[in-house]
Every structure is written in structure tokens, then in C-alpha cells.
Swiss-Prot record:
The keyword Calcium does not apply. Keywords: Leucine-rich repeat, Repeat. Residues 17-67 form the F-box domain. Pfam families: F-box, FBD, LRR_At5g56370. PROSITE patterns: FBOX. This is F-box/FBD/LRR-repeat protein At1g78750. The lineage of its organism: Eukaryota, Viridiplantae, Streptophyta, Embryophyta, Tracheophyta. Residues 376-428 form the FBD domain. PANTHER family: F-BOX/RNI SUPERFAMILY PROTEIN-RELATED (PTHR31900), PROTEIN WITH RNI-LIKE_FBD-LIKE DOMAIN (PTHR31900:SF33). LRR repeats lie at residues 152-183, 184-209, 231-258, 302-327, 345-370.
């Protein structure tokens, strides 16, 4: 603290009012609660009133990154561990609202790992509500969470990153509502299934799967779950046939982003409202969609039927390509409730889009994201029957247009086939900003099925 600030805190005769120090201690502790713990401890030098206040803050946020060795790119891990260990001894009988610990266990060895286990056991006994443990050791999985974690009755929020989880003999997490598991190594597939099934009020589940997590079958079964995210790094060197089954009758939001999973089995998702899908059902490593593979076709059909009740959908072009290939064998199910659609293109041809739009009879809003348009011979999107975009009202093409032929074909298709389109929003690339008048002139020559349509250029 600078001299002026220190004078405001300590001077009794000053006209300036130190309104912060005049706050009740309970409120001051809540203010300190939102600061990194190392900064909270520093507040003890402000005045005699602040000297011991940090000991009563109801939450710890401890990170080895706060112990940077000056003029180097390294951290003082030993000082960090000593600091945390001594810190945990203060007011050890009080209840904790939150505890966040970030460390790097590379080279720690058993004595140091035992320290971390002791800290976890301590915060569990102090009835912690919000717990986050992050190991930045680059997938070494040296640290395994102690079994006391599985029976913490007060825990409401839990996030684990870079850790190992044993297969628990007994789980009871009656208060847990939100669970985030990132790059976590499970002892077996039952470890995850048991953990989820014994969280009776779990509402939000977020799983970022590890590259070494190769269980053939993973089941997410929950009667209370409202939101589920399943993400994995796309690694096309892996050629695994993995299955994920989801049984969550109250689920409202679903995000799937994993190209390795061969089959997503969706059971009873009638409550689903919103989905974000980026999967190719393991059609990677030069594996192509095979029309004669009836098992794959049945799985894709069941998957599409499983999400057909949604109102909002974000879908990757890679997924759309699989759906397009499937549609040449069987008709797509109708997405009668779908009113908002976003398609993100990453180097795939957008000509697949109209086939999917045919299955969305009540679509009102369409956003075409980062598309990479490429000329393609032999493709005629205007062969799609006119008027099937009978409900579409708003379209936005976010990728900056460069005036290329395929871009203008997309714009023409939308204008010529949308019965009640109210607004088409386009973005121009900076390289052709000076040619905006030329683009506008070309747009004005395109017939519009909807006379009320307004074209806006950003």
C-alpha cells in the first residue's frame, strides 16, 4: 500500500473517512473472500483490526502460481506447500464455504502428496460447500483423491482437474448440484457411473475426457440432471469404438464434442431444449460413412430422434456432413420444435445445409458461422423445392463475405426460398469494404420471395 493509502487507514485525525475499515467484520470477511488467499493474508498489515481478520475468511484460493521465483520462469513449490500447510492450521475447527487448490505434483513424491490428501480431508471435515482441486502436472495423475471426498454431505460444487479417481466402495453426496471433471483418470468405467448415480440432486455435469480414458462404455444416469457437457480433444490418431449412454429424463441442455465416440445412446430425453453437437461418430482416420453398415445407420437415426424435440441447436459442419450422408439412405426425422439453428462451418461445403433445413418446418432463426466456401462442380442447391423455408424469419451470415460466387449463391438461395424472411444480415470482409456499393447492387438484383425482407450489411 502506498503512503497515502496507509495514512487513510491509520490516521485518526484525518478528514478522510476510512469507510472500509468501519464495515462489520462479517462483511469485511465476505469482501476478502473474493480475493486470492495470498492477497488476503497481506491485508493483515493494514492495521491492528485487520491483523487477524484473514483467519476468519470462509474460503481459501491457493495456487502455486502465486509463488513465482523472481527473474525466472519457475515456481517455489516448497514455499508454496509450507505456506498452505501452515495456513490450514489456522482456525481449523471453523466451517469452510469454499476451497480451491492449484498445484503441480510433478516430482512431488509421496510425502508431499500425503500433505495434499491431509488438506482435502481437513476441508471435508470442515463441511466445505465449494471445492476445486487442480493438478497442473501434465497428465501425470500422481494424486488420487482420498475416499473422504465421496461422503462429503455438505458439498454443493466440485471441480477436479488432472487427478485420479479410484472406484469408490461407498458414495454419498446428497447436496452436490454441480460437478466438473476435466482430464480425470478413472480407475474403471464404474467409478464415474457410481459417482454420478449417488448424487441425487446433481443438476450440472461437465466432463472433459482424458486422451487416456479409453473405457469402451460410459454411462451417465441421473434422475435430476438438467445440463450435461461431454468434451474431448479431437485426436484423429486414435481409432477407438467407444460408447456413451445418457439416461437423464429431466435434461434440458446437452453439449457433445467428441469425434472418438462411435455411439451416443440417448434414453428418454423428452425434456431436452437446447443442444450443441460436434461429433462424427468415430468416422475418422479415413473411415467413411458406409450405407451398408446398418448398425451405424440405426445408431445415427436413434441419435437424431433422441434430440429431435429441441428448440435450439448448434451443430458443427462435420456433424452435418455425417447427417447429409445418412440422409441419402434414410429420411431425417422432423425437428418440429426447432426454432433457432446455428451451423459452424470449418472447411466443409455448406451445400449440405438445405437437406437438414427440410427437417425443420418451424425454424425461425438461422446463423451461419465461420464458413469456408469453396467452388464445387456438380452441386446444385437450387434443386431443393422452393418454399420449404416457410417459417424462417431471421438469417445472419457471420463470416465476412468477399463477394465470391459460392457466397452469393448462398445469399441467393436464402432470399429466393424464404417465404416470410424479415431480415438477412451480412458481414463484409475489410478487403471489399470499398466495394460495398457493388455488393449492394448485386444483392438488389436477387429476387426475394419475401417482399418484407430487409438486407443489412455490417
Amino acid at each position: 500500500m502506498d503512503g497515502a493509502g496507509e495514512k487513510r487507514v491509520r490516521a485518526k485525525g484525518s478528514r478522510e473517512v476510512d469507510w472500509i475499515s468501519n464495515l462489520p467484520e462479517t462483511l469485511l470477511c465476505q469482501v476478502l473472500f473474493y480475493l486470492p488467499t495470498k492477497d488476503v493474508v497481506k491485508s493483515s498489515v493494514l492495521s491492528s483490526r485487520w491483523r487477524n481478520l484473514w483467519k476468519y475468511v470462509p474460503g481459501f484460493n491457493l495456487s502455486y502460481c502465486d509463488f513465482h521465483v523472481r527473474n525466472t520462469f519457475s515456481y517455489d513449490h516448497n514455499t508454496f506447500l509450507r505456506f498452505v500447510d501452515s495456513f490450514m492450521g489456522f482456525n481449523s475447527q471453523s466451517c469452510l464455504q469454499s476451497f480451491r487448490l492449484e498445484y503441480d505434483s510433478s516430482g512431488y513424491g509421496e510425502p508431499k502428496l500425503a500433505l495434499i490428501r491431509r488438506w482435502i480431508n481437513s476441508v471435508v471435515s470442515r463441511k466445505v460447500k465449494y471445492l476445486g482441486v487442480l493438478d497442473d502436472s501434465c497428465d501425470n495423475y500422481e494424486f488420487e483423491m482420498p475416499p473422504t471426498l465421496y461422503t462429503c454431505e455438505t458439498l454443493v460444487y466440485l471441480t477436479l482437474d488432472g487427478l485420479s479417481l479410484a472406484s469408490p466402495k461407498f458414495v454419498s453426496l446428497p447436496s452436490l448440484k454441480e460437478l466438473h471433471l476435466s482430464i480425470v483418470k478413472f480407475a474403471d468405467h464404474m467409478a464415474l457411473e457410481t459417482l454420478i448415480s449417488q448424487c441425487p440432486v446433481l443438476e450440472n455435469l461437465n466432463i472433459n475426457r482424458s486422451f487416456c480414458d479409453d473405457f469402451e462404455f460410459t454411462c451417465v444416469r441421473s434422475q435430476s440432471l438438467l445440463s450435461f457437457t461431454h468434451v474431448a480433444d479431437t485426436d484423429e490418431m486414435l481409432n477407438e469404438d467407444l460408447v456413451v449412454a445418457i439416461d437423464a429424463p429431466k435434461l434440458k441442455y446437452l453439449r457433445l464434442s467428441d469425434h472418438r465416440i462411435a455411439s451416443f445412446i440417448l434414453n428418454d430425453l423428452a425434456s431436452l431444449v437446447e443442444a450443441d453437437i460436434d461429433t462424427v461418430f468415430n468416422l475418422i482416420c479415413k473411415k467413411m460413412f458406409n450405407p451398408n453398415d446398418l448398425n451405424k445407420r440405426n445408431m445415427i437415426r436413434d441419435f437424431l430422434v433422441g434430440i429431435s424435440s429441441i428448440k435450439t441447436l448448434i451443430i458443427a459442419s462435420s456433424t452435418l456432413e455425417v447427417i447429409y450422408d445418412y440422409s441419402r439412405c434414410e429420411p431425417l426425422p422432423l425437428f418440429r420444435n426447432l426454432s433457432s439453428l446455428r451451423v459452424d462451418f470449418y472447411g466443409y461445403k455448406w451445400e449440405m445445409l438445405p437437406i437438414f433445413l427440410e427437417s425443420c418446418p418451424n425454424l425461425k432463426s438461422l446463423v451461419v458461422g465461420s464458413a469456408n466456401y469453396r467452388e464445387k462442380e456438380g452441386i446444385n442447391i437450387l434443386s431443393v423445392p422452393r418454399g420449404f423455408l416457410s417459417s424462417l424469419e431471421y438469417v445472419k451470415i457471420e463470416r465476412p463475405l468477399k463477394g465470391e460466387a459460392m457466397e452469393m449463391k448462398l445469399v441467393s438461395y436464402l432470399l429466393e426460398n424464404s417465404t416470410i424472411l424479415k431480415k438477412l444480415t451480412l458481414c463484409l470482409d475489410d478487403s471489399i469494404k470499398k466495394e460495398e456499393s457493388v455488393i449492394l447492387k448485386e444483392l438488389n438484383t436477387i429476387p426475394r420471395l419475401s417482399s418484407a425482407c430487409q438486407v443489412v450489411i455490417l
